[in-house]
């Protein structure tokens, strides 16, 4: 389970330390790919395989399906953590997410996202603006 928000440095080679609390869940490997809103998404290999099966089963005749498959699969990087618990984010993915020398890693339960700090602040502002909508969603769940 991925929970919490962490700010980490990206070194000159593009390596990013994964939070220690996340590392056990990534012992079998991690897949990093383009996310929504110009962030990156990280998945444990097993969760990625489940998602890939479901997305691959969608009808290829649909333009939306093809675009989703391109977004997820063409930019995906399959990797393992190094001995220091870091991943090497490929240059094309760093450029996509506009990552410099800092990144925010946000846990989202079954996966995590990697954001530029500037974009993450925008996300937090949008969450504040939509708080009443989120309260309604929780009410729909009878929570």
UniProtKB/Swiss-Prot annotation:
Gene Ontology molecular functions: DNA-binding transcription factor activity; transcription cis-regulatory region binding
Gene Ontology cellular-component annotations: cytoplasm; nucleoid
Broad class of where this protein is predominantly found: cytoplasm
Subcellular location: Cytoplasm, Nucleoid
Record bears the keyword Nuclease: no
CDD domains membership: MraZ_C, MraZ_N
Entry keyword set: Cytoplasm, DNA-binding, Repeat, Transcription, Transcription regulation
InterPro entries named in the record: MraZ, MraZ_C, MraZ_dom, MraZ_N, MraZ_sf, SpoVT-AbrB_dom, SpoVT-AbrB_sf
Domain of life: Bacteria
Gene Ontology annotations of biological process type: negative regulation of DNA-templated transcription initiation
Occurrences of domain SpoVT-AbrB (ranges): 5-47, 76-119
Stored PANTHER family: TRANSCRIPTIONAL REGULATOR MRAZ
Subunit structure: Forms oligomers.
HAMAP family reported for this sequence: MraZ
Entry's family note: Belongs to the MraZ family.
Protein name according to UniProt: Transcriptional regulator MraZ
Species whose genome carries this gene: Roseiflexus castenholzii (strain DSM 13941 / HLO8)
């Amino acid at each position: 389970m991925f929970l919490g928000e962490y700010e980490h440095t990206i070194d000159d080679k593009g390596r990013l330390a994964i939070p220690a609390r996340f590392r056990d869940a990534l012992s079998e490997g991690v897949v990093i790919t383009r996310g929504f809103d110009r962030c990156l998404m990280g998945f444990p290999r097993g969760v990625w395989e489940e998602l890939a099966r479901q997305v691959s089963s969608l009808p290829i005749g649909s333009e939306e399906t093809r675009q989703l498959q391109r977004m997820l699969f063409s930019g995906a990087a399959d990797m393992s953590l190094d001995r220091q618990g870091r991943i090497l984010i490929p240059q094309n993915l760093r450029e996509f997410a506009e990552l410099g020398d800092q990144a925010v890693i946000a846990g989202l339960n079954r996966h995590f996202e990697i954001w530029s700090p500037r974009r993450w602040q925008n996300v937090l502002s949008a969450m504040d603006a939509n708080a009443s909508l989120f309260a309604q969603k929780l009410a729909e769940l009878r929570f």
